[in-house]
């Protein structure tokens, strides 16, 4: 079964959110909940991915990579989506 981009992103966020070790990072849990809510309410996957990618990049560095593997996997997903979104946004600016 193929999943939509929304479903893939929500599944990846849920996987991180449900990790037992994430309870040690309440600020991260709060952001993950916020971004999953935005997707559920119909916000663009690209826009949410861009914001989440930026947040996760800083968060991962701040915590010296001492976070679960599922968070790194989520970062890979949102990084790809945010690059596509930024590319389309740039086309609109430069054309």
Curated annotation (Swiss-Prot):
It comes from the Bacteria. Imparts immunity to bacteriocin hiracin-JM79 to naturally sensitive host strains. The gene is hiriJM79. Transmembrane segments: none annotated. Pfam families: EntA_Immun (PF08951). This is Hiracin-JM79 immunity factor. Gene3D superfamilies: Ta0600-like (1.20.1440.50). Keywords: Bacteriocin immunity. GO terms for biological process: bacteriocin immunity.
């Amino acid at each position: 079964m193929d999943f939509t981009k929304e479903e893939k992103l929500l599944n990846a966020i849920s996987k991180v959110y449900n990790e037992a070790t994430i309870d040690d990072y309440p600020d991260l849990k709060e952001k993950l909940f916020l971004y999953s809510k935005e997707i559920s309410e119909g916000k663009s996957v690209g826009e949410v991915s861009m914001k989440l990618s930026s947040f996760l990049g800083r968060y991962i560095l701040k915590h010296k990579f001492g976070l679960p593997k599922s968070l790194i996997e989520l970062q890979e997903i949102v990084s790809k989506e945010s690059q596509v979104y930024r590319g389309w946004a740039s086309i609109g600016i430069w054309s």
